[in-house]
Amino acid sequence: MAGYRADDDYDYLFKVVLIGDSGVGKSNLLSRFTRNEFSLESKSTIGVEFATRSLNVNEKVIKAQIWDTAGQERYRAITSAYYRGAVGALLVYDVTRHSTFENVERWLRELRDHTDPNIVVMLVGNKSDLRHLVAVQTEDAKSFAENESLYFMETSALESTNVENAFSEVLTQIYHVVSKKAMEAGEDSGNVPSKGEKIDVDVSAVKKTGCCSN
C-alpha cells in the first residue's frame, strides 16, 4: 500500500518524467501527488522542476523523483538531459482538448528517441472532472495505449481522481522490472542494487505487456 515516508529513507530512487503539451495539467498532477495540492491559478512553470515522494511497494521504499517539463514544451526545447536516466513517464493530454491528444504520438516518439523504447509509460487523460467538455473519447485513448503497449488512466488533478493510482502503477511496474533483473542476476550481490542506489533500468531486457485501466 502506498504511503508517505521520510525523504532520506528509501531503497530505490526512480526518475519519472512528465511530458505532454502545455496546459494539460502536468504541474498540478505533480503537486497533487507529491504535496496533495492543487492550484486553479497554476501558471506555466519556468525552468526545470522536480519533486519527490516515497511509496511502499512490496515492502520496499521507492523514492520517486518526478520531473516536470517546466514550460519548455512550448518551445520544443526539451533536451536529452531531461530524459536521461528516466525509467518511467506519464504522457499527459487534456481530455477537453483534442489537439493535445493528437500530439501524444509526437511526444511518445521523442520520449523513445531519448530513452529505452520499453520504458514504463502511462498515457494519462487529465481533467476528467470536465465531463461536459470531453473531446477525447476514452475508447480512442485506450485503443492508442493498447497499440503502443502503454498503461492508461484518466485522471483529475482537481478532484484527485486516479492521480495516486497512475503514479503508483508506474512505480510498481518499474519495481517489477528491477526485481526481475535482480533475480536473473542470481546470487551475485555485485549485480544487485545497494540500498539507496539510483536505478537506471535497462527495461529492454524485460518484455512488457500493455495494461489499460480506467
From Swiss-Prot:
Membrane topology: Lipid-anchor
Lipidation (S-geranylgeranyl cysteine): 211-212
GO cellular component terms given for this protein: early endosome membrane; plasmodesma; trans-Golgi network membrane
GO molecular function, one term: GTPase activity
Any one biological process term the GO annotation gives: cell wall biogenesis
Expression sites (tissue/organ): Expressed in the vesicle-rich apical dome of growing root hairs.
Keywords noted in UniProt: Endosome, Golgi apparatus, GTP-binding, Lipoprotein, Membrane, Nucleotide-binding, Prenylation, Protein transport, Transport
Top-level division of the source organism's lineage: Eukaryota
InterPro entries assigned: P-loop_NTPase, Rab_GTPases_membrane_traffic, Small_GTP-bd, Small_GTPase
Places the protein is found: Early endosome membrane; Golgi apparatus, trans-Golgi network membrane
Principal localisation: membrane
Span(s) of short sequence motif Effector region: 42-50
Positions that bind GTP: 20-27, 68-72, 126-129, 156-157
Pfam family, one: Ras
UniProt cross-references to NCBIfam families, sorted A to Z: small_GTP
Family affiliation: Belongs to the small GTPase superfamily. Rab family.
Described function: Intracellular vesicle trafficking and protein transport.
PANTHER family cross-referenced by the UniProt entry: DRAB11-RELATED (PTHR47979)
Protein's recorded name: Ras-related protein RABA1d
